[in-house]
Amino acid sequence: MAKAKFERTKPHVNIGTIGHVDHGKTTLTAAISKVLYDKYPDLNEKRDFASIDSAPEERQRGITINISHVEYQTEKRHYAHVDAPGHADYIKNMITGAAQMDGAILVVAATDGPMAQTREHVLLARQVGVPYLLVALNKSDMVDDEELLDLVEMEVRELLSSQGFDGDEAPVVRVSGLKALEGDPVWVKSVEDLMAAVDESVPDPVRDRDKPFLMPIEDVFTITGRGTVVTGRAERGTLAINSEVEIVGIRPVQKTTVTGIEMFHKQLDEAWAGENCGLLLRGLKRDDVERGQVVVKPGSITPHTDFEANVYILSKDEGGRHNPFYSNYRPQFYFRTTDVTGVITLPEGTEMVMPGDNTEMTVALIQPIAMEEGLGFAIREGGRTVGSGRVTKIIK
């Protein structure tokens, strides 16, 4: 049978299950998949628990992550759902941005309440910029006492509020993934209610095209008689011909006008997010711009050198370092298209960082980079990736 074409008729939303190990993330993922298949068989594929549970190994920037991707649809939306079974997998996935989430379902077992990993996942979700969390109080079939459920719900709401999410308003839905998988009508309805809450409460993502224009420069060359052309893949936004732009990063910010846009040697009136294109820049010489800078809508992004980050350091088995590093370690930080040297300061109380650890750190780059919170980077030594991270806070 021919593979069905991806229909762009509905909003597409990336979502995931997060929370403590053994609280039932994978079972709930399978239950959502089954319940929606039973309700809308023409919109969904049949997926069983085993196929989701055997999360295949992926390599993202050299980091090994076990992760399952499940697709499903409600009447309103098309969802891509990621489930990272292990605690370490989840942390690597969040920090490396292997799967960007527009919202996440925090799974908390009603029998246990929030645990240490629950807290860590919520904190990390906030740091890497997951915009919205809602809660599935799983295994609710195993708690007979209504008051106990109320208490757990209160605890979860407090946890969300303490990490900067809307703990008062976030939906908390009492579900049982296992009972829903078994077809128990009461708990099947609970999963339907959960997805109705996801449909209603997770905001439609802002599409890349609607954001301010940004294109990292990959190459610069001169076209005789026409001027300087920079090439790259537009990361976001749209750019019309004759627009003013800024060139940001590495050197002082420069203003110029885009007088021509080309793709595959064809002239275009507009460049769109996701397209590889060449931009002809008025009045700039080849030596005025370089790889590693970005072409942006004026005023939309600024250059910075000092920032805080959350970082995962590759283990030896992943091809990372063989020994720990300390404060004042000076590797290269690879942002978008270029390496910049930076000096690391570890947080108070952290003596050293071992391969395979995740840590927070402060970094001072020797050259400014166009930066905003949530931006991902790789840490490299001599061209080899030894870590991956995201900017959590800009200092200067």
Curated annotation (Swiss-Prot):
Listed GO MF terms: GTP binding; GTPase activity; translation elongation factor activity
Ranges where the record places region G2: 62-66
Ranges where the tr-type G domain occurs: 10-206
Region of interest (G3), ranges: 83-86
Signal peptide location: none
Region (G1): 19-26
Assembly, per entry: Monomer.
Protein name stated in the entry: Elongation factor Tu
